Amino acid sequence: MTRKFLHTSDLARAVGVHPNTVRKYADWGLNPPVERTPSGYRLFTQQHLDCMRLARLIYSAPYPGRGFRALGNEIVQHAVMYDWQGALEKAHEYLAIVRAELQNAEGAADLLEHWVQNMVSISGNESPLAIGEVSKLLGVSIDVIRNAERNGLITVPRNTYNNYRLFGKREIERLRIIRMLGKAGYSHMAILRMFLELDKGNIRDLKKTLDTPRPDEDIFTAADRWLTTLRAQETMARQVIELINEITAS
């Protein structure tokens, strides 16, 4: 039976991109090798269109970091090698990782509310600690603590005699929440945004504040709205699984 070939323009129309983008996907290895006519025209097949649809779906989502892009690349490469079962397995792995990250991020944001309530009852009568002592207590480097201070996440009082930092209970607890939110994937900008509201006495909707850039934040990353990013990744992963199942069923 004669194979049905598709032209560059056919793929471009099917996925809604410029023809040059189709050529780039082939050059970048996001499509299987492409046959050419004696005159040099590319001859695509349904396999190329399927891979193009898959790659467009994966790469159209915001880049979240934390190894997601590498796993997305693996899904595409399995498809390029005609290994749709391998692509499906990797897609399910992707979805499981995203859901675990989302659960972790949601849990950290929920713990934030509990922390805020406890902060109200914290007294400042304990003997302050030096930065090295805080580093050992929290299991973070001194540079991490200094970086939090430089980025405005914490203000640390100083000894009037030697200018050494003095970390009281409030500062230490604030560093704990910075560490927790950072490990959960939230950016320094998101944490700072939350603290700015908290320091003004606004203790409601801090979870929403973590996920909502202010109007003056002209440039922001995926981690500046981490919950939204992860939910978008979850949706994308489910769509990838549906697409692969559709392709293999046809």
Where are these regions (language model features)?
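Ligand/cofactor pocket segment of small-molecule handling proteins
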Residues: 127-133, 152
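Arg/Lys-rich, alpha-helical DNA-contact motif
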Residues: 2-15, 27-38, 42-127, 169-250
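Short alpha-helical "recognition helix" segments of helix-turn-helix
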Residues: 11-12, 134-136, 148, 191
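Residues within the helices of the helix-turn-helix
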Residues: 8-9, 23, 132, 146
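Major-groove DNA-recognition helix of helix-turn-helix-type DNA-binding domains
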Residues: 19-38, 141-162
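Short helix-capping and hinge/turn segments at secondary-structure transitions, especially at repeat
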Residues: 136-143, 150-159, 172, 180-187
